[in-house]
A protein has these predicted regions:
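Immediate post-signal peptide segment of exported/extracytoplasmic ligand-binding proteins
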Residues: 14-27, 120, 190, 195-200
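Predominant activation on well-ordered alpha-helical scaffold segments within soluble catalytic domains
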Residues: 42, 83, 182-186
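Short, glycine-/small- and polar/acidic-enriched structural segments
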Residues: 1-57, 66-69, 73-79, 90-97, ...
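Conserved C-terminal helix/tail region of periplasmic/extracytoplasmic solute-binding proteins
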Residues: 186-212
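Secondary-structure end/capping motifs
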Residues: 119-195
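Pocket-lining segment of extracytoplasmic ligand-binding domains
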Residues: 61-151
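Short phosphate-engaging motifs
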Residues: 16, 36-37, 81, 124, ...
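Residues at alpha-helix termini
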Residues: 48-50, 88-89, 153, 191-192
Length: 212
């Protein structure tokens, strides 16, 4: 997945915070150290230019409890969780992942597989990728996928539609798109996941099975 529309940060409806610039001295949630929400929180705080403390709060459900009880000022979530609270006017969104310009065109979600498996089962892996691409086409072709997703997750169809159309736009799920690697590697170095950016030959090896 390229682009970053699938995570958002929110406050209770009664909060005086309307943007991160209002949140000096406050706390801002992410899931766990090293997660995408962690990296995004750090980037959002840096971009806001104010002193906000990033805190790990676990799952969206656990985070909502902490926010609504006043333990944390700004919560994080990933749809469909939180859509019902938004619709009910209990919370307000104050930031989204894509507020950081570098994330808008960065590939932020992908499938990974064991190299031994890929070497031994290349045809099977290719079939999986083709099936994934066909499924994505079906998901956005009409309302059948909305009905299925609502049934699977136990949420109303309208919340399923909001989740798909607002937070997972079709353009973000182009499987052949791979972009923003330079910025991603800078983040990886800063987070100490790697010691230095990968060379072109290393990138070619890493993505040799990527769907083209």
């Amino acid at each position: 997945m390229t682009g970053a529309d699938d995570l958002f940060w929110y406050v209770p409806a009664s909060s005086p915070i309307y943007s991160l610039k209002d949140a000096a001295g406050k706390t801002m949630a992410f899931s766990a150290n090293g997660s995408s929400s962690n990296l995004a929180t750090i980037a959002l705080i840096r971009q806001a230019g104010v002193d906000i403390k990033a805190v790990a709060t676990g799952t969206p459900a656990a985070t909502l409890v902490q926010v609504m009880s006043g333990q944390v000022d700004i919560g994080w979530s990933g749809p469909p969780f939180g859509i019902d609270a938004l619709q009910a006017g209990k919370i307000r969104i104050v930031a989204v992942y894509s507020d950081v310009p570098a994330f808008r065109n960065m590939t932020v979600r992908m499938h990974v597989a064991n190299l031994s498996f890929l070497t031994a089962h290349r045809e099977l892996a290719d079939r999986f990728l083709r099936a994934n691409a066909e499924t994505l086409d079906w998901m956005y072709a009409g309302d059948e996928a909305i009905t299925e997703f609502a049934s699977m997750t136990g949420i109303p169809p309208e919340q399923a539609r909001i989740t798909r159309d607002k937070f997972y736009p079709r353009g973000n799920l182009a499987l052949t798109r791979l972009s923003g690697l330079d910025d991603a590697m800078k983040d990886a170095v800063a987070a100490r996941f790697i010691t230095e950016p990968l060379r072109n030959d290393q990138l070619d090896e890493l993505f040799k099975y990527y769907l083209r």
